[in-house]
């Protein structure tokens, strides 16, 4: 068999080369289109991602916050409902008249440790402070406090004695030193409790009332028989109010260089240190709380919170002939399990509430917790 020799002409070869070039160009175009398509997809993806982030960042803060619930540590009770009803009807009360005053010990802060916090500070200074040399009279007074604690009887004259003597035992101490002294004491464990420091012994349900009132544009004042400087130290980091809103017993100040000169005659020089002079000026207790309110605030409060007969004067002052609706609340120390309650004292205050048209607050029945759910009694009292 013979094969014929195939001869490819120049024209045929040129045609083949052209077809190959066209195919290659098509392939290149397809590759470029694929790359372009991928770039477009990537661009759109990043663009959509950016839009999503913008939307998330523009969501108002209130939409992602938990809803504020007032008085969360309270059970459904008369006091809670009366307060909420009162707040829901204050639109006619101007902001400058929205004044609430609170006693401190027994109303906002523990007073059964097992006695007033400032009395325990007095004993700490006289009996435990190696930097202080107490007089025999001061030691005797400290023993009287111990006896009162043991026998659960508080003589009427003991309060006045302690306040006058407290001025003396801190005589010569600068205000910043006094503040540190109080705060160091408050770092100690609270007597008779687990998981509680003295300085944290605030009643959580009452702090919620302050928060609730502040959200409704109330001006909060603390009106206490405890000395004003000590109250400032106690509430610091716990209650957000100006220092000027604290009304308490006043101790006189002096310049460290003043000597025996009176405040009327002495002229203060630049950068002189101020110290406690050792003298009581004003005891802000009982009826004198009205004096303190008038001098420091200048108008009647429309809400009063207290816990004892020492608060009765300012309570009746607020709810008598007030140009605005007003209420007075009294805390009953009737919880014998979570707190060192005193049922006889609570029953007496309950009768006073009924007599004077005050609203009682029961620690036992109205509060879900007192100091926090992790705080328990241990019955170890010194």
Predicted regions and their residues:
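N-terminal Lys/Arg-rich, disordered targeting/topogenic segments
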Residues: 1-18
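C-terminal cap/substrate-recognition subdomain and adjoining C-terminal extension
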Residues: 54-70, 81-84, 88, 92-94, ...
């Amino acid at each position: 068999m013979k094969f014929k020799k195939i001869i490819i002409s120049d024209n045929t070869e040129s045609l083949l080369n052209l077809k190959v070039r066209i195919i290659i160009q098509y392939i290149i175009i397809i590759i470029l289109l694929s790359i372009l398509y991928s770039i477009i997809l990537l661009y759109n993806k990043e663009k959509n991602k950016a839009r999503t982030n913008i939307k998330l960042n523009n969501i108002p803060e209130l939409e992602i916050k938990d809803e504020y619930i007032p008085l969360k540590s309270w059970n459904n009770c008369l006091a809670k409902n009366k307060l909420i009803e009162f707040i829901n009807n204050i639109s006619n009360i101007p902001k400058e008249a929205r004044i609430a005053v609170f006693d401190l010990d027994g109303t906002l802060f523990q007073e059964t440790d097992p006695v007033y916090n400032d009395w325990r500070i007095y004993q700490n200074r006289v009996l435990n402070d190696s930097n202080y040399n107490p007089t025999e009279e001061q030691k005797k007074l400290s023993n009287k406090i111990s006896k009162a604690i043991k026998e659960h009887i508080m003589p009427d004259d003991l309060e006045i004695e302690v306040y006058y003597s407290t001025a003396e035992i801190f005589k010569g101490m600068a205000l910043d030193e006094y503040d540190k002294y109080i705060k160091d004491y408050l770092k100690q464990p609270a007597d008779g409790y687990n998981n509680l420091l003295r300085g944290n012994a605030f009643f959580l349900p009452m702090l919620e009332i302050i928060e609730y009132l502040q959200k409704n544009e109330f001006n909060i004042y603390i009106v206490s028989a405890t000395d004003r400087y000590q109250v400032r130290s106690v509430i610091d980091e716990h209650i957000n109010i100006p220092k000027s809103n604290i009304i308490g017993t006043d101790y006189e100040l002096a310049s460290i260089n003043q000597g025996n000169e009176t405040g009327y005659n002495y002229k203060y020089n630049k950068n002189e240190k101020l110290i406690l002079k050792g003298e009581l000026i004003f005891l802000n207790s009982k009826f004198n709380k009205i004096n303190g309110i008038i001098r420091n605030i200048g108008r009647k409060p429309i809400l009063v919170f207290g816990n004892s007969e020492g608060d009765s004067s300012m309570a009746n002052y607020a709810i008598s002939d007030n140009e605005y609706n007003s209420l007075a609340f009294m805390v009953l120390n009737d919880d014998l399990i979570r707190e060192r309650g005193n049922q006889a004292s609570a029953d007496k205050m309950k009768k006073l509430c009924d007599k004077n048209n005050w609203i009682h607050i029961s620690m036992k029945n109205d509060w879900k917790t007192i100091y926090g759910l992790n705080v328990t009694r241990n019955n170890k009292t010194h």
